[in-house]
């Protein structure tokens, strides 16, 4: 008897570069697995905006770093994510940005605002938690 095994597709950053997907969706790769989600809703984005406003106020006062909404982080060919909010010190930010303006390593702080749905929750509470831990993110906040 012959057995067959199916190897799951392992997505890469190069695949996303040529992928002509629906631009109203968010495409992320974690450990080669493709996660496709709808664009965040108004409430989700309002929460992100409020968080960034507070971080920006603090950053302007302290002069220590910068915050951003939805920056791409390309950790590797098989790990490419778009967190809701990040904060990075000026010192670290200089080392992290590539020529295209993407982060290429861990910022100090990553914040994800939970969207409804088991798949979204699993991605943020499990897959992204593991990824950010392994890649050196110092603080990971999940806002629900």
Cite the ranges covered by each PLM segment.
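Gly/Pro/Ser/Thr-rich low-complexity, intrinsically disordered segments predominantly at protein N-termini
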Residues: 1-144
């Amino acid at each position: 008897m012959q057995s067959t095994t199916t190897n799951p597709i392992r997505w890469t950053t190069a695949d996303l570069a040529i992928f002509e997907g629906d631009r109203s969706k968010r495409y992320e790769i974690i450990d080669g697995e493709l996660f496709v989600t709808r664009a965040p809703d108004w409430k989700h984005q309002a929460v992100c905006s409020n968080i960034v406003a507070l971080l920006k106020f603090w950053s302007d006062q302290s002069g220590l770093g910068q915050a951003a909404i939805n920056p791409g982080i390309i950790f590797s060919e098989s790990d490419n994510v778009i967190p809701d909010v990040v904060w990075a010190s000026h010192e670290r930010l200089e080392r992290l940005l590539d020529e295209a303006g993407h982060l290429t390593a861990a910022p100090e702080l990553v914040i994800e605002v939970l969207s409804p749905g088991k798949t979204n929750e699993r991605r943020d509470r499990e897959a992204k938690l593991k990824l950010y831990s392994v890649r050196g993110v110092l603080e990971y906040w999940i806002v629900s």
